[in-house]
Amino acid sequence: MQIRFFATNRDRQNLGLNVDRDTRIKLLKFGYHWVDMKKYMAHYLATTDPSTMPPGVIIEDSEETVFNKFLKKEAVKHIIIGTHGYNVPFHGALTSFSILADTLKGALKKHNFTLIADPEEKIDIDNSNQNLIAFVGFSWPSNGKVLDYNSDRTECVQSAPALANLISYIRTKKPDIKIYVIAHSMGSYLVCHMLEQLVNQAFEPTELNEEIKNRLKRKDRGGENTFFVDRYFMLAPDVERREVTKCDLGGSEYTGPFYSGLEHLVQESHVFYSRYDNALKASVVEKDAIRESLQKGFELFTGPDLQKRWESSLGLNPLPALAPNNVYSHNATVLTNRQIDHGDYFDAPAIIDQIANIISEANTSRIPELPWRFSESSDRPLIE
């Protein structure tokens, strides 16, 4: 299985060079464009050049190709958006999430869902009685070089409005759709920044109607029952655990920048972590040895800034008790009964089964009178 469509803000500087002015404006409007990955891989495998994106791979009429012929079909009742991490070229993003989609398809079938990644698959997509989950990707300008960590983080933050525009646009076309975001590594940093900026009203999505405005309301301002994202899966998140916490005991008041976005705009978030993640261990060393040392040097002149502290990664640790109540953590090592490294999440059956279970639960009404128990691999309550 290969994911057919990726939305991306890669190579924007060369976008629309071979099209007329109106088409170019339309392609630039939302901060991302759609790419036919079948055509892109034909280019990449022929040239082995990941640095270029020929005009022929860009979908000029995405409304017809991506939406009318795929995502807007009545049979499609859920959409998964996968977004990758640091040091991932475009073809690498496709490979990783196609592996995940392939594994997830079998797991979801046990729950009577059919995952579809290409409208040309042998599935009756016009049958509205089908219960289809469409899988698309979102790729941001990760440089694909090991030494570009900081520049990738900058690109990651700058890509947040584009991802928000994508989700908002999907919701304008299918108001009742359930949207699940699966982010790996630094992709979680991107999603968390998007949520932070939305809840703080740093920007608004380009496509914004009353229904979406309600989804963007904080719970304490009337947004109790609708959410911008239904389920958010964080695989090996390259996010500081203190960034998702709220500390207000005694004299140590601190609210992490991502706390409110996760609390108010996502119905449930699920963190999958492993203490054997070598990439995140290296990231912790880099932040501790370089970034925090430089920051504390600056603070000799500017005074302390508690927002700029680095402690340990969320992807290496159990979820802190100070995180929002709608965020849950899952120990990937316990789930799989083996050591899980940074790239092992995409096709580990036990992890994928857990994701499928959570998606299934998102579409099942719970009965609160039933007794609860706790999974050994999660702090998530389960029905007996």
Curated annotation (Swiss-Prot):
SUPFAM superfamilies: alpha/beta-Hydrolases. The keyword rRNA processing does not apply. GO terms for biological process: nitrogen fixation. Gene3D superfamilies: alpha/beta hydrolase. Coiled coil: none annotated. Keywords: Nitrogen fixation. This is Uncharacterized protein alr1448. It comes from Nostoc sp. (strain PCC 7120 / SAG 25.82 / UTEX 2576). The lineage of its organism: Bacteria, Bacillati, Cyanobacteriota, Cyanophyceae, Nostocales.
